[in-house]
């Protein structure tokens, strides 16, 4: 009698264990697709964030080069027009001729960079990824350095002239130097953007 009772009480316990095991299996089986879906969403989100960051960097670099283009144009145009006769002619001063030369160089460089950007926007062929970023970084740095050297060379002579005579010639010289300095700032910031893009470049 006691054996029968034990057998009958053991059967439900075994059924309960089997049911629990089946439930665990169902949970595990349903969790795998959910984990895979979550992982896929994470990858997609990371890719979207990367695209947005690249787009922001591209727009920032282009905007800074547009500003540098405008400032460099003003720098050499204002200095080139700074001709008021006698000693008040920029051609008489090596420092001012240097400002004009570097302003023209910066203008040409930024023009070429903007043309490259336009080619990319229209789906044209540009340099390969890493090479393009290296060209941007090196070009921005070198041009910014040259602009800063031109500004540094022209400031002392302008200050000495203004101590003796503050006139339209010295004012125009100061305005040109200021434009060259703003062009330097824009290209220096653009070099930082290019450097960040170079550091984040993938090597696959």
Swiss-Prot record:
Extracellular side: 82-98, 152-175
Main location per the UniProt record: membrane
One GO cellular component term: plasma membrane
Annotated transmembrane regions: 61-81, 99-119, 131-151, 176-196
Top-level taxon: Eukaryota
Keywords from the named record: Cell membrane, Membrane, Transmembrane, Transmembrane helix
Family the UniProt entry places it in: Belongs to the Casparian strip membrane proteins (CASP) family.
Oligomer and partners: Homodimer and heterodimers.
Record protein name field: CASP-like protein 4B4
Protein source organism: Oryza sativa subsp. japonica (Rice)
Species classification: Eukaryota, Viridiplantae, Streptophyta, Embryophyta, Tracheophyta
């Amino acid at each position: 009698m006691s054996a029968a009772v034990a057998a009958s009480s053991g059967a439900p316990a075994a059924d309960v264990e089997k049911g629990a095991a089946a439930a665990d299996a169902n949970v595990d089986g349903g969790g795998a697709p959910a984990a895979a879906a979550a992982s896929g969403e994470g990858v997609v989100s990371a890719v979207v964030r990367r695209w947005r960051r690249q787009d922001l960097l591209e727009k920032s670099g282009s905007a800074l080069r547009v500003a540098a283009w405008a400032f460099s144009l003003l720098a050499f145009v204002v200095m080139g027009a700074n001709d008021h006769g006698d000693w008040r002619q920029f051609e008489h001063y090596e420092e001012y001729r240097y400002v004009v030369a570097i302003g023209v160089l910066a203008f040409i460089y930024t023009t070429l960079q903007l043309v490259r950007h336009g080619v990319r926007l229209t789906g044209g062929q540009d340099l390969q990824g890493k090479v393009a970023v290296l060209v941007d970084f090196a070009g921005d740095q070198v041009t910014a350095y040259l602009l800063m050297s031109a500004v540094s060379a022209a400031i002392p002579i302008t200050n000495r002239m203004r101590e003796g005579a503050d006139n339209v010639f010295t004012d125009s010289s100061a305005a040109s130097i200021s434009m060259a300095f703003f062009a330097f700032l824009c290209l220096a910031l653009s070099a930082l953007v290019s450097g960040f893009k170079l550091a984040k470049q993938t090597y696959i």
